């Protein structure tokens, strides 16, 4: 499978955005409760795809695995940009 030189479009449904945000919040709290550094663990999962970065505690592992990692990254980028005053469409 090769790469193309043309730009590919990616679109996430608005309903999924809210659910991803809620899931990340719940996973963050579960990681925190277990004594992990939530940011490091979530980054580890997103970069590697290895669900072992997220514990089964409070069903956090199953919750985060409902979404593709690229969907999670899109939501994180959108949230960051909006928080910095950029009107993201």
UniProtKB/Swiss-Prot annotation:
InterPro entries named among the record's database cross-references: IreB
Family stated for the protein in its record: Belongs to the UPF0297 family.
Record's protein name: UPF0297 protein SUB1776
Species per Swiss-Prot/TrEMBL record: Streptococcus uberis (strain ATCC BAA-854 / 0140J)
